[in-house]
Curated annotation (Swiss-Prot):
GO terms for molecular function: methionyl-tRNA formyltransferase activity. Belongs to the Fmt family. This is Methionyl-tRNA formyltransferase. PANTHER family: METHIONYL-TRNA FORMYLTRANSFERASE, METHIONYL-TRNA FORMYLTRANSFERASE, MITOCHONDRIAL. It holds the Pfam family Formyl_trans_C. NCBIfam families: fmt. Keywords: Protein biosynthesis, Transferase. The keyword Kinase does not apply. It comes from the Bacteria.
Length: 311
C-alpha cells in the first residue's frame, strides 16, 4: 500500500525528498512550488524552481500559486483528495484549510533540532552561532512557526570548518531518507508524535545583506563562523585595497589561525588576518564577477602584504 501525497517545496534542498518519495512508490498527486522568477541579466527570462524542473522530469502535475489564501485555491487542494502533504522549504504560509486539507495532515522536513532555530535560515544560523550539532526533523505542521510535534529526528555533526553549503548538501540527503521513513511509518499507522520542549527556543531569522559584512573587531572564532555560515550564499565580504580604491571581496572559506595585530590587518602573506582576539586564515575568496579562487591564487593577483588593512 502507498499513500497519495501532495509535495510542496521550491529550492534544490527539497528535490532529493521529492525524488525519494516518488522512488518509494508513493502516488504524488500534485507538486506545489513557487512561481517562475525573472532571471538573466535583464530579468527577461523566467526560471522555474528546482522542484518545478524535477517535477516535470518525473511527469508530475505542478501548481504555482502566488498564495494559498483564496477559497478557490483551497478548494483545488481539497479536491486532490491526498492522504498527506509533505512540505520541504516551500516558502509560502499554509493556512489552516491547507493544513487540514488532507486525510492525515501536513508533514514538514525542517533543517534543525527543534525548538532551536525555528524559521527561515536554520542551516546558516546554526553555523554562525558555532553550534557543533544540528539535525533534520520531520514534524506534523500546525499553524505556528515550526511549532508542531516531532515525528522523527536525525542528528548531524557540524565540522569546525564546515560551510553552510556543505552542511546543506549533507542535510538535504539526510532529510530525504528521514521523510521516506516517516511516511512509511505514517502509512503503517506507527508514526509517533512528541510535543516540542517548551525551553530552548531560538529563531533563525532570514539573512539580510546588512549583516553580511565581516566585523574584524570580533573574536576570531566568531569571524570564522560568520564566514562559513554565509558561504557560498549570500557570502560574507570585506573591502580590500586595490590601488587607490577599495575592492569588495567575498570570503568563502577560512580556518582559525595564530597571531595578533590590529583588527583586519594582514599578519602574514598566507592571508592570516588579525581579529579582535586571535586570527583567521582565509582559504578561498571571490572577486565581484569572478570565480572562487584559493588564497594562493588570489595572492598571485593581489599581493596583499603584511600590514595591509581589510575593512
Amino acid at each position: 500500500m502507498t499513500l497519495r501525497l501532495v509535495f510542496m517545496g521550491t529550492p534544490e534542498f527539497s528535490v532529493p525528498t521529492l525524488r525519494a518519495l516518488a522512488g518509494a512508490g508513493h502516488e504524488i498527486t500534485a507538486i506545489y512550488t513557487q512561481p517562475p522568477r525573472p532571471a538573466g541579466r535583464r530579468g527577461l527570462e523566467l526560471t522555474r524552481s528546482p522542484v518545478h524542473q524535477a517535477a516535470e522530469e518525473l511527469d508530475l502535475y505542478v501548481r504555482t500559486p502566488q498564495s494559498l489564501k483564496s477559497e478557490e485555491e483551497q478548494q483545488v487542494f481539497r479536491e486532490l483528495e491526498a492522504d498527506a502533504a509533505v512540505v520541504v522549504a516551500y516558502g509560502l504560509l499554509l493556512p489552516r484549510a491547507i493544513l487540514e486539507g488532507t486525510r492525515l495532515g501536513a508533514f514538514n522536513g525542517h533543517a534543525s533540532l527543534l525548538p532551536r532555530w525555528r524559521g527561515a535560515a536554520p542551516i546558516q544560523r546554526a553555523i554562525m552561532a558555532g553550534d557543533r550539532e544540528t539535525g533534520m526533523m520531520v514534524m506534523k505542521m500546525d499553524e505556528g512557526l515550526d511549532t508542531g510535534p516531532i515525528a522523527m529526528t536525525e542528528k548531524i555533526a557540524i565540522g569546525p570548518d564546515m560551510t553552510a553549503g556543505e552542511l546543506h548538501d549533507v542535510m538535504k540527503l539526510a532529510g530525504a531518507g528521514l521523510m521516506v521513513a516517516a511516511i512509511a511509518a505514517l502509512e503503517q499507522g506507527e508514526l509517533a508524535l512528541t510535543p516540542q520542549p517548551a525551553t530552548g527556543v531560538t529563531y533563525a531569522k532570514k539573512i539580510i545583506k546588512e549583516e553580511t559584512r565581516v566585523d574584524w573587531s570580533r573574536p576570531a572564532e566568531e569571524v570564522h563562523n560568520h564566514i562559513r555560515g554565509l558561504s557560498p550564499l549570500p557570502g560574507a565580504w570585506c573591502e580590500m585595497p586595490a590601488g587607490d580604491k577599495a575592492e569588495r571581496v567575498k570570503l568563502l572559506r577560512s580556518t582559525l589561525s595564530e597571531g595578533s595585530g590590529a583588527p583586519g590587518e594582514v599578519i602574514d602573506e598566507g592571508l592570516a588576518i588579525a581579529c579582535g582576539q586571535g586570527a583567521v586564515r582565509l582559504l578561498e575568496l571571490q572577486r565581484a564577477g569572478g570565480k572562487p579562487v584559493s588564497a594562493a591564487d588570489f595572492q598571485r593577483g593581489s599581493k596583499l602584504g603584511r600590514g595591509t588593512r581589510l575593512t
